[in-house]
């Protein structure tokens, strides 16, 4: 076990495959180049080895079967002794520690009053107090303690709130459900309430609590941790247990794992116990010990064992975040990004020279690569969620330079494959449930992050021009001319096409029902908002294409809702809870969209009179959506659905009244509205669009954008350019190294321009590609060619058939006859850059339209 002990204590010795591939347990270790034909145990005993994934001798003894790499042949590599000695002497003199680095980050972000990093947080907190917590004239609410989040609730909450914040920030339907979520803006609220003065608690003498626990007790609590913790996918159970057995385990990592386990394992629930807790089992003592171990850890040890350090940091950061300690959590997670970035660079650089080692037939390098990938996506998801709450843009990540998504299911997970091969299967079902949630979280994060940054970096010309001083306005105009890009009215169409392709991929590739339902609900909800995206200040007429797309989205959402009660129950209740809440928000968005469509519908247009069958179908959809809102499985979200039910009940009758008159007779809009209001006198929709509270904010108005308006009317239509922000803070937000040029420290992720127009097309399409023109992959596909004549025929087609709305739904029907056009590329390229305006105030949320329906019954 000596060779494996070195790997457990020093993960940098483990291999790094060029690309993760499917694991084949039938492949013998003798076929792997660079490995001994005999396992470590057989070579030590000098007995014949069967050379299987788990040899017969190790299987009989029920021990780990390890195949170590062969010794290098030839002369050893010459090393520069002078440079190495000089660097070692310099390192000994400076003796930097992890605690010093974390404390420096804490001071720069939250204590210091100068610098872009501190201004980023402090200005966001000030804007939050001004615009979110602004007391009403009627009363000043008393401050209430912010409720904490459990671990599984926080993990499930991330994806849901990212979608919700995107809709509230750039959607067209207001923010009625803002107050219905007690954890809304959890990060910025925790940051605004916190007054922690330092990164670490005052030092005190403390004996190691691990020695007093005993190995058997430690192993049992580790099993319990893998049973209950939602982040179990960032730790390999087999590698951790082997390190405990060999006494090479990272004490900080083990202490934080035991702290979480003992906190969940409450002996007070057992009536046969006295309820007393021994000091070595105190979660606070273990947590303090883990933080102290990391605080005094030399940075050289971090570089030698980066994976275990990153695991301890992300678990500590997650615990602090769930407790509402946002300051320390930001630093822990930020430094985790830095550690993962360095290891990612090192593994990419040394990919061809890495030695391979197998444990029970599984490549340890693939296991470590999966762990790093899972930690990376947790960091990215948390950072994206936090930056969206503080209303700041962030660096877009080039997809070909980031790790792959986490494993879609347990069959492709090297971590779980190793646990099965090692017979560590007691907590496997819980580990599978925890691992399955990382994939939809990563999918939603990557999608929402790009849409958020696109909208945030493509505001209206009016707001940005007025934001610049008069004596520099011409400089911004020249810069806009230099950075030509597509017309902003095309943005919704581009995003719509990309989301449709993402929906097609999810429907085709994802087999887990709960994951598929959550992703489809989230993306269809975004599409509903995009159809009425407030990109223009004046409302545009509703077109048959808008009616068609909205009808197909509602039909798909109804299909998903019909399947929700039959979905298998998740072992993590919070995941099912927030997935169901996402459906409630989706139904609320559909109700807003139907009311908006009715209020802006012009019956005097001939093409609108011809769309009467489509409106009848929408009325039926409104009726079915109203029935879904009354379902028992949505009963916990009455605060969201109560106004939605009122809107749906009203718009159902209003749309039917709109279609009662013969289409051959022109009917005025006022007559139709009066007919609808005759049945519901207490309900009369307002036609005034939402207004901006102050210049400079992106509109949350009610202007509906026709898809025809997305297409320039003439080849000479001038494209709109984007005015760059007034301030560009340090893009290396979490990095202290000049080579790390991005928010998360990964190389090559910060670019000088978020858009690059290389196409001569008059519409200046936005297409997503890499720097070398290659496609990003299945997730980021090319946008449709909106100048193609087939798209016009698609938009002019019959709104939608009269088939059952809860059957045969999917992206193909949303695409219409032009679905085949979604894969066309114009060759334009997509770059990224971190644009921040730290002085920009937090957006003032406009009130929703629920007040219109406050007196209307369900």
UniProtKB/Swiss-Prot annotation:
GO CC terms in record: nucleus
Ranges for region Disordered: 1-35, 72-99
Gene3D superfamilies assigned to the protein according to its UniProt record, in alphabetical order: Zn(2)-C6 fungal-type DNA-binding domain
MF GO annotations: DNA binding; DNA-binding transcription factor activity, RNA polymerase II-specific; zinc ion binding
Pfam family, one: Fungal_trans
Description of the deletion phenotype: Loses the ability to produce pyranterreones.
PROSITE patterns xref list: ZN2_CY6_FUNGAL_1, ZN2_CY6_FUNGAL_2
Matches recorded under SMART domains: GAL4
Subcellular location: Nucleus
Domain of life: Eukaryota
DNA-binding region: 39-65
One biological process term in Gene Ontology: positive regulation of metabolic process
Keyword Nucleus attributed: yes
Role: Transcription factor that regulates the expression of the gene cluster that mediates the biosynthesis of Pyranterreones, a family of antioxidative compounds.
PANTHER family tied to this protein: ZN(II)2CYS6 TRANSCRIPTION FACTOR (EUROFUNG), ZN(II)2CYS6 TRANSCRIPTION FACTOR (EUROFUNG)-RELATED
UniProt protein name: Transcription factor pytR
Organism: Aspergillus terreus (strain NIH 2624 / FGSC A1156)
Lineage, opening ranks: Eukaryota, Fungi, Dikarya, Ascomycota, Pezizomycotina
Gene (UniProt): pytR
